[in-house]
Amino acid sequence: MKFFVDLNSDIGEGYGAYKLGMDEEIMKCVTSVNCACGWHAGDPLIMDKTIKIAKENNVAVGAHPGYPDLLGFGRRKMVVTPDEARAYMLYQLGALNAFAKANETKLQHMKLHGAFYNMAAVEKDLADAVLDGIEQFDKDIIVMTLSGSYMAKEGKRRGLKVAEEVFADRGYNPDGTLVNRNLPGAFVKEPDEAIARVIKMIKTKKVTAVNGEEIDIAADSICVHGDNPKAIEFVDRIRKSLIADGIEVKSLYEFIK
């Protein structure tokens, strides 16, 4: 049986004179990137530059829309109506798409950021609104969302292209959601453990939740981070370990049809 997976990372998350992450370095290790669109991070110049660098590295690009929350980096919950959620996503998707077009490339996917991502994964009204927006904008854009979530299931039911995402360094609740960042078990800190978990998720479609329960999971894409040199080394180790274990690493557009 053949196994393959995408490696994705969030990039373009600086703002003005402030730089965040090691974008050029992480692009050497991943197959897809999620570019901030100006609301939780990023700005027009960073968005343009990020698209250029991704194209030079032959890495697929996706939009990474967040809530309008620069001070909270898009990680704080907001009360928004479904129509606001749809409009927020479309506004940012359209902005990044303009830079993609200007650089003669196309957006591969859309992945929400932070609180927007977590809330839309489980809140039906928000998920439906975001999916409505994708249908209005471009049905060929892949929707990357939390594995096993309502958004993933509903997107597939609608016939949209959906990539189910897992996290190399995050803990899982028994219901398949991510453990809150402020709670024990939120992060997998040992590289060897994280790599073993990732391989298990891909090959067995199972992961061990924080309570010890084995839960179902699908892994089309693995989210990794490139915040510092150690993180880059970790991602490089993940990629090499996947390949050594017979798992092909490639962009979503190559296998999500």
UniProtKB/Swiss-Prot annotation:
Instruction: Report any Pfam family annotated for this entry.
Output: LamB_YcsF
Q: Which reaction does it catalyse?
A: 5-oxo-L-proline + ATP + 2 H2O = L-glutamate + ADP + phosphate + H(+)
**Gene Ontology biological process terms in this record:** carbohydrate metabolic process
Q: Which GO terms describe its molecular function?
A: 5-oxoprolinase (ATP-hydrolyzing) activity; ATP binding
What stretches pass through the bilayer? none
The enzyme's E.C. designation: 3.5.2.9
Q: Which domain of life is it from?
A: Bacteria
Q: List the disulfide bonds.
A: none
Q: Which UniProt keywords apply?
A: ATP-binding, Hydrolase, Nucleotide-binding
The record's note on quaternary structure and interaction partners says:
Forms a complex composed of PxpA, PxpB and PxpC.
Q: Which family does it belong to?
A: Belongs to the LamB/PxpA family.
| Record function comment | Catalyzes the cleavage of 5-oxoproline to form L-glutamate coupled to the hydrolysis of ATP to ADP and inorganic phosphate.
UniProt-recorded name of the protein: 5-oxoprolinase subunit A
Q: Which organism is it from?
A: Fusobacterium nucleatum subsp. nucleatum (strain ATCC 25586 / DSM 15643 / BCRC 10681 / CIP 101130 / JCM 8532 / KCTC 2640 / LMG 13131 / VPI 4355)
The lineage, from the top, is: Bacteria, Fusobacteriati, Fusobacteriota, Fusobacteriia, Fusobacteriales
